[in-house]
Amino acid sequence: MRTFALLTAMLLLVALHAQAEARQARADEAAAQQQPGADDQGMAHSFTWPENAALPLSESAKGLRCVCTRGFCRLL
């Protein structure tokens, strides 16, 4: 009976350890997705409005350019 209890306890510990490793792997993966990697930092999007845009632009807004990088946008 004592052997059965020890085997059951060991099996339970192994199962809990495997479950903890799986949770840690998921947490590490989620943290890696949230942090911008080296390849993401160089990515930027740029938008320009042509002179014949569908919406009429004021004289000061013609040729206005928006550059968006990860986290913020700025007008040029």
UniProtKB/Swiss-Prot annotation:
There is a cross-link at residue 65 (Cyclopeptide (Arg-Cys) (interchain with C-73 in subunit C)). Disulfide bonds join 68-73. Keywords: Antibiotic, Antimicrobial, Defensin, Disulfide bond, Fungicide, Signal. There is a cross-link at residue 73 (Cyclopeptide (Cys-Arg) (interchain with R-65 in subunit D)). There is a cross-link at residue 65 (Cyclopeptide (Arg-Cys) (interchain with C-73 in subunit B)). GO terms for biological process: antibacterial humoral response; antimicrobial humoral immune response mediated by antimicrobial peptide; cellular response to lipopolysaccharide; defense response to fungus; defense response to Gram-negative bacterium; defense response to Gram-positive bacterium; disruption of plasma membrane integrity in another organism; innate immune response in mucosa. Residues 25-45 are annotated as: Disordered. There is a cross-link at residue 73 (Cyclopeptide (Cys-Arg) (interchain with R-65 in subunit C)). Residues 23-64, 74-76 form a propeptide. One of its GO terms (cellular component) is extracellular matrix. The keyword Transit peptide does not apply. Forms a cyclic peptide with subunit B (BTD-1), subunit A (BTD-3), subunit C (BTD-4), or subunit D (BTD-7). An additional intersubunit disulfide bond is formed. There is a cross-link at residue 65 (Cyclopeptide (Arg-Cys) (interchain with C-73 in subunit D)). InterPro entries: Alpha-defensin, Alpha-defensin_N. There is a cross-link at residue 65 (Cyclopeptide (Arg-Cys) (interchain with C-73 in subunit A)). There is a cross-link at residue 73 (Cyclopeptide (Cys-Arg) (interchain with R-65 in subunit B)). BTD-1, BTD-3, BTD-4 and BTD-7 have antimicrobial activity against the Gram-negative bacterium E.coli ML35, the Gram-positive bacterium S.aureus 502a, and the fungus C.albicans 16820. BTD-3 is more effective against E.coli than BTD-1, BTD-4 and BTD-7. BTD-1 is a cyclic heterodimer composed of subunits A and B; disulfide-linked. BTD-3 is a cyclic homodimer composed of two subunits A; disulfide-linked. BTD-4 is a cyclic heterodimer composed of subunits A and C; disulfide-linked. BTD-7 is a cyclic heterodimer composed of subunits A and D; disulfide-linked. This is Theta defensin subunit A.
